[in-house]
Amino acid sequence: MASRRRARQRALQILFIWDARKQPVEDAINAYYDTLYSDEKPERDPFVIDLVRGTVEHLAEVDDRITRHAEHWRMERMPAVDRNILRLAVYEMTRGGTPAPVTIDEALELARKFSNEESVQFVNGVLDAVRREMPEPNAPPARLNS
């Protein structure tokens, strides 16, 4: 099985295909694996598939969180790679069970690899703002006043 970092790269590439082609997520997953592996058909990494499907399934919530913290940027005006790095990271941070610092670090690595230094700073700022609005992992549950 691929490392988690490689899995996130693959998930990003699939999300990029999905976003660019405006096609069903399963078609994007198939297109990625069929294009990347034309002669052999490796076992699909469940972590990759879960990240992609989860991001798309919760897209409205994910995009809303990004939009609230991406000052002066509309989703459709962001570079596609940055938009999908943010989507992947916000999903993983809020629903995927990965600690926020790990998710942010991994997203910054993706931005360094697939985008530019300005994007690294932008991604860091947005994800840090999303992290700050999340409840602390070990915080006691909020009490309801009766």
Swiss-Prot record:
MF terms (GO), sorted A to Z: RNA binding
Any one GO biological process: transcription antitermination
Keywords, in A-Z order: RNA-binding, Transcription, Transcription antitermination, Transcription regulation
Pfam families per the UniProt record, alphabetical: NusB (PF01029)
Gene3D superfamilies, alphabetized: NusB-like
Acyltransferase in keyword set: no
InterPro entries to which the protein is assigned, alphabetical: NusB-like_sf (IPR035926), NusB_fam (IPR011605), NusB_RsmB_TIM44 (IPR006027)
GO CC term (a single one): cytosol
Functional note: Involved in transcription antitermination. Required for transcription of ribosomal RNA (rRNA) genes. Binds specifically to the boxA antiterminator sequence of the ribosomal RNA (rrn) operons.
Family in the record: Belongs to the NusB family.
Protein name: Transcription antitermination protein NusB
Organism: Solibacter usitatus (strain Ellin6076)
Phylogenetic classification of the source organism: Bacteria, Pseudomonadati, Acidobacteriota, Terriglobia, Bryobacterales
